[in-house]
UniProtKB/Swiss-Prot annotation:
It comes from Mycobacterium avium (strain 104). This is Putative S-adenosyl-L-methionine-dependent methyltransferase MAV_4557. Its EC number is 2.1.1.-. Disulfide bonds: none annotated. Belongs to the UPF0677 family. Keywords: Methyltransferase, S-adenosyl-L-methionine, Transferase.
Length: 315
C-alpha cells in the first residue's frame, strides 16, 4: 500500500501526522480522568481544547456516536485498550527518563516530541536540560498553548524545531547539546512514520552523539506491523468506520493512520543497538501492559499495537 507521505511533507497540528499527536493526547486525557490513572497529564486536555473539535477527541469523549457502536460493537473496548496502551507507553518512557536522570544524566533528548508535556509535568532533577525535537508548527502550538495557561517547564527546556529527516544533529548541537556528556533519548510513536533508511540513519546519528553510559528508549515495530493479515484487518476496519462516519457526520473526517506509515522491512531495533555496543532489554507491548496491570481484553487484543519497547544503555 502506498503512503500519503512525501519526502519533505510538513503539517499543522490538526493535519496528517500532527493530528495523530492529538489522538495520543486524547488517550492521555482519558487516562488522567480515570479512577486509578497510571499517568497524570493535566495538559493533555488543554491541547485538545485548543485544537477544537475533531475525531482526535474520541478517546476522551463522554460517548461515541450510537450508530458507530451499533456498526462496530467492540469499539468501546478497542478504545479502552488503546487508552491502556498509550498509558502504559507513557509510563514506560516517563520511568525511563526519571531513572536515567536519577542516575546523574542531565541531558535528555525527546525525538518527535509531539504534544507530550514531559518538560512541564515530570519532576526533573535540578540542572536537567530537555531538548525537544519536532516539526516547527507542532512545537509552536505546544508552546503557545501552554504559555496561555501560565504553565512553566520543570526543567531547562530547549525547543529544537527541525524535521528529523533533515540535519537535526547539527541543530541539536547548535541548541547547546554536549555530545561528550552522557545523555538519555526517546523515540516514542516515531518508527512507523520513518522509512527504513531514515530509521537506520536516525540510529547512526544517535550513535554519533552519545558516549558510554548514555541511554536510549525506542518504541519499535513488532512482527505484527508487516503481517499481511493484520494489515488487511486494519484496513477493513478503517474502511467500515470511514464509510459510516461519512454518512452520519460528513464534516468530521476520520484519518487513515496507515496511510501515513511506511510499511518496509527494517532491521530489528534491539539487534541494531546490541550490535553497536549497547546493553539491551526488550519488552513486548502485551507484557508491558500486563506489568502495569492494564492488559487488553481478549476480544480486542489484536487491535492493540504489537510493538516492542527497547531500552538500551551504551557500554
Amino acid at each position: 500500500m502506498s503512503t500519503a507521505r512525501t519526502d519533505d511533507d510538513s503539517w499543522e497540528i490538526t493535519e496528517s501526522v500532527g493530528a495523530t499527536a492529538l489522538g495520543v493526547a486524547s488517550a492521555r486525557a482519558a487516562e488522567t480522568r480515570s479512577e486509578n490513572p497510571l499517568i497524570k497529564d493535566p495538559f493533555a486536555q488543554v491541547f485538545l481544547d485548543a485544537a477544537g473539535d475533531g475525531v482526535w477527541n474520541w478517546h476522551s469523549a463522554p460517548q461515541l456516536p450510537p450508530e458507530l457502536i451499533e456498526a462496530e460493537p467492540t469499539i468501546p473496548l478497542q478504545q479502552q485498550a488503546m487508552v491502556s496502551y498509550m498509558a502504559s507507553r507513557t509510563a514506560f518512557f516517563d520511568s525511563f527518563f526519571l531513572e536515567a536522570t536519577g542516575a546523574g544524566i542531565r541531558q535528555a533528548v525527546i525525538l518527535a516530541a509531539g504534544l507530550d508535556a514531559r518538560s512541564w509535568r515530570l519532576p526533573w532533577p535540578a540542572g536537567t536540560t530537555v531538548y525537544e525535537l519536532d516539526q516547527p508548527r507542532v512545537l509552536e502550538f505546544k508552546e503557545s498553548t501552554l504559555a496561555e495557561h501560565g504553565a512553566q517547564p520543570a526543567c531547562n527546556r530547549v525547543a529544537v524545531p527541525v524535521d528529523l529527516r533533515h540535519d537535526w544533529p547539527e541543530a541539536l548541537r547548535q541548541a547547546g547539546f554536549d555530545a561528550s556528556a552522557p545523555s538519555v533519548w526517546s523515540a516514542e510513536g516515531l518508527m512507523p512514520y520513518l522509512p527504513a533508511a531514515a530509521q537506520d540513519l536516525l540510529f547512526d546519528r544517535i550513535q554519533g552523539l552519545t558516549v558510554a553510559g548514555s541511554r536510549v528508549a525506542v518504541e519499535a515495530l513488532g512482527p505484527k506491523f508487516l503481517d499481511p493479515q493484520a494489515r488487511a484487518k486494519r484496513r477493513e476496519r478503517m474502511d467500515r468506520i470511514q464509510a459510516l462516519m461519512a454518512r452520519i457526520d460528513p464534516d468530521r473526517a476520520v484519518p487513515r493512520t496507515d496511510e501515513l506509515w511506511y510499511f518496509e522491512e527494517r532491521e530489528d531495533v534491539g539487534e541494531w543497538f546490541g550490535r553497536h555496543g549497547w546493553d539491551v532489554r526488550v519488552t513486548p507491548s502485551d507484557e508491558l501492559m500486563a506489568g502495569y496491570g492494564r492488559p487488553a481484553p481478549a476480544e480486542v487484543r489484536d487491535f492493540v499495537p504489537g510493538n516492542l519497547f527497547v531500552a538500551a544503555q551504551r557500554r
